[in-house]
Amino acid sequence: MSVNLFVAGTGTEVGKSYVTGLIIKKLNSLGCACGYFKATMSDSGEDAKRIKEVAGITQDEATMCPYVYKTEALPYIAGRVENNPVSLDVIKDAFDRVGKDFDYITMEGSSGICCPISDELMLEDIVGTLGLHSIIVADAGVGCINSVVLTASYMIMRDMHVKGIILNHFVDGDENCEENLRMCELLTGVPVIAKVKDGDTDLEIDEDTLLMLYA
């Protein structure tokens, strides 16, 4: 049976896919058999291709996501346009199948955490059904504090277990980035567990800290 983690983003274009790929790459370097999962994708599944490139994995793309849409839109819109609405049962079955092939599953979220998957289903409902602990990925630049605090507060209010924050596009020694890190920890009570700089090809994180995210 696999152990699993959900990667939430504070919004689109914060580098969620890239960071997820680095997490999987790091786990595999430690000898962990790690698979990737995402409930829905738009843009004909380009996220899966990016993950494979960053993480260096050979997982079959057909197993990485049960709902791959051509329409570039939120899942509930894409599902309506393409007449293929999302079913929670289909997602759970697909996730369980991946869990039979890998010891660790890293699931990437769609857009931000407050993301409607259908009229009746929110992203958080999927995370809750699958019983996943979570981390938050955010851009370390302007707007970081607001987006992280709002995301963490929402997730905690919804009884989602947030185990850490990863700041992307971080610049060591930059006062704004350093202060954003400090204030995110202070205001949320959630630790920043890693900083990713532009051009990083490996995730700098303590091995025990990484493995504890999945515990």
Question: Predicted segment positions?
Answer:
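Short, hinge-like loop/turn segments at secondary-structure boundaries
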Residues: 50-55, 153-155, 181-184, 210-213
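Hydrophobic anchor at the beta1->P-loop junction of P-loop NTPases
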Residues: 7
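Switch II (G3) loop of P-loop NTPases
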Residues: 91, 98-118
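N-terminal phosphate/diphosphate-binding loop that engages ATP/GTP or pyrophosphate donors
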Residues: 4, 18-85, 89, 94-97
